[in-house]
């Protein structure tokens, strides 16, 4: 029975890896085709007769597809580093507000029509600087936000930041949370969320790596990620870590 279970687990892993490879093909081809098509159109005869406003819109689409392609490549490289145990962080003094704003701005083009992207940032933390890996923290928040964008068709996506004191541990804690009004996540699927290659039913975009990478980044930053969700009524992904203002 144990041996059979091992075979089943191996087969399941192989199936997930095959799906992942198919997803890579789609996630690379889609932005590449868009980049080639938009560039040809912009530099062709039609582009020469475009209004400046239309040219700017085209350039914006090119930029968004380039960003999407870069995100895919970064996720693939980070997966490789995770499997080798070589995913690292480099801490510096960074602006907390700047990190949150960069993550929010990076996903604006992915928000579906009818969804409001907003943030709640305490005035008391506006000028806060912390010692952490700003690039990795931004990546974690961006993945949280992208996940919300993929599953929220109406309502809102809200990035919330707060600081509080954990009396039990005697430390000040930073919590950054992304709340959405999407479809929510069934209880039986929640344990799989932070594992590689996992995607929700009906999810068309993404490689299924973002949340797995988030969990690893959180550990390296000395924090944790967790989920609060209702099957009907949206989800809330949060990251918490101890911090001291610089």
Each predicted region: which residue ranges?
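Primarily the dimerization/phosphotransfer
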Residues: 4-44
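Short alpha-helical segment of the dimerization/phosphotransfer core of two-component systems
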Residues: 64-69
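Helix-loop junction within the histidine kinase core
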Residues: 76, 80-91
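A conserved beta-strand-to-alpha-helix junction within the catalytic ATP-binding
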Residues: 90-105, 138
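Short conserved segment of the HATPase_c
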Residues: 185-197
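Short alpha-helical Gxxx[C/S/T] motif in the catalytic ATP-binding
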Residues: 210, 214
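Glycine-rich ATP-binding loops of the HATPase_c
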Residues: 222-228
